[in-house]
Amino acid sequence: MKKKPKIPRAVIGTVLVFVVLLSVFMAGHDLWRQKQAQDTFEDLADLVTAPEDPEESQAESSAPEEFAEAQEPQEEQRNLSLLFEQNADCIGWICIPGTAVDYPLMHTTEDSEKYLRKDFYGAYSINGVPFLDGRCSLESANLIIYGHNMKNGTMFGSLKNYTDASYYAEHPTIELETAAGKALYTIFSVMKVQKEDAWYRFLTVDTETDFLHQIRYARECALYDTGIIPTYGQQLLTLSTCYGSSGGDGRLLIVAAKTE
């Protein structure tokens, strides 16, 4: 029997070096793409928070110190009309103060997951953009919003911190700003579920009994008791992201009720 020819060590070494270099390149490329995506979001945030009249802003900043101290701090307002003009799929801005969640919100009914891997401008993006479930409207009883659980903590990557009750205590409120204004939602349940969980089918409310049943379910599945029980008529908002093993069916839900 003829012996199989041995592969020269030099060839094996070359292949191994190539594989290592390719892995390093791919990892670096992913980091670069994530950085590009985050830069885009920061540019959008700067765009919507920039003063409409730079001269007026300069005048306010140069006001005498005694008058500046007397002025009450104004709540930051975003000029979302600039985003709406650039992309009609944008319906608002989602933010959890003090966290990395601070992004435009997209919505498409025909292709619900259009922004799963696209940036605000429609180009490919590993980060995607948070988007409202295509079955929802801004008047739905339960606004389900999706975002990626990025390893670097961007997008909805910081939501996993809500598995710790102390983090919830520091960040209990979600802000949703739309053309109608800013609404605040107070988190009342943090749940670990599967992607086919019944909660994803809860979009409308027919009766008070139905609403209370859903609230009971969310509180029973909660990782800890927040002490908050929503009342009938309050709109709910759910942030959904992947949780657990990569590519698995686990999902983390942050559920909040509209307070104002």
Residue ranges of predicted features:
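Solvent-exposed, non-transmembrane regions of membrane-associated and secreted proteins
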Residues: 22-260
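N-terminal Sec-pathway targeting helices
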Residues: 2-19
